[in-house]
Amino acid sequence: MVFRRFVEVGRVAYISFGPHAGKLVAIVDVIDQNRALVDGPCTRVRRQAMPFKCMQLTDFILKFPHSARQKYVRKAWEKADINTKWAATRWAKKIDARERKAKMTDFDRFKVMKAKKMRNRIIKTEVKKLQRAALLKASPKKAAVAKAAIAAAAAAKAKVPAKKATGPGQKAAAQKASAQKAAGQKAAPPAKGQKGQKTPAQKAPAPKAAGKKA
């Protein structure tokens, strides 16, 4: 790309830093390789010498003679409508957006985040619709498969498993039923001994003799 922004008489420049930062001026005369005589009659910048390092050249050029007086510079500026043209450029819009972003609060940043999420969601749904329409238009076989997949997904989404209700009344009824069931069960009968078997009787000990025989 050919460079076209040269230092010349009538070139409009943007002041990037200094006491007049953010304003536009027109180059009236070139003093030397480091400085130029500038004037900004419509931006409240008086005629003065300014170094090139604090200026950024724009694409706008005014037509007025060398070292012209301020009234001629003002007339050329208003005729070219520089302020309106500058406000419509991407450069000026970026500067304005940067300034507005620096002044934002936390709530403003939150609102911007929510708006971006909503925008992305809308874009995604529209893209999916266009893709589906293109797929249906491309081949009838794929269209049938896509329709079946969409119907299956909708049916699966609509079919929600019913959860068992566990309210206090139902809990009490369940506990009562379990208690009745436990009461109705019979205790297991004790184990019986085998038939024909008798328990052995214990013999009483024999009394001792009163005396010994002679």
Swiss-Prot record:
N6-acetyllysine, modified sites: 79, 85
Subunit relationships: Component of the large ribosomal subunit.
Chain positions with N6-succinyllysine modification: 85, 203
Region span, 2 X 3 AA tandem repeats of K-G-Q: 192-197
InterPro entries: Rib_uL2_dom2, Ribosomal_eL14, Ribosomal_eL14_dom, Translation_prot_SH3-like_sf
Function: Component of the large ribosomal subunit. The ribosome is a large ribonucleoprotein complex responsible for the synthesis of proteins in the cell.
Localization per Swiss-Prot or TrEMBL: Cytoplasm
4 X 5 AA tandem repeats of Q-K-A-[AS]-X, as annotated region: 170-189
Cross-link (Glycyl lysine isopeptide (Lys-Gly) (interchain with G-Cter in SUMO2)): 124
GO MF annotations in UniProt: RNA binding; structural constituent of ribosome
GO biological process entries: ribosomal large subunit biogenesis; rRNA processing; translation
Name of the protein this chain belongs to: Large ribosomal subunit protein eL14
Signal peptide stretch: none
Protein species of origin: Rattus norvegicus
GO cellular component assignments: cytoplasm; cytosolic large ribosomal subunit; cytosolic ribosome; postsynaptic density; synapse
Pfam families per the UniProt record, alphabetical: Ribosomal_L14e (PF01929)
Sequence repeat residue numbers: 170-174, 175-179, 180-184, 185-189, 192-194, 195-197
Chain residue ranges for the region called Disordered: 158-214
UniProt record similarity statement: Belongs to the eukaryotic ribosomal protein eL14 family.
SUPFAM superfamilies found in the cross-reference section: Translation proteins SH3-like domain
Keywords, in A-Z order: Acetylation, Cytoplasm, Isopeptide bond, Phosphoprotein, Repeat, Ribonucleoprotein, Ribosomal protein, Ubl conjugation
Chief location: cytoplasm
Modified residues (Phosphoserine): 139
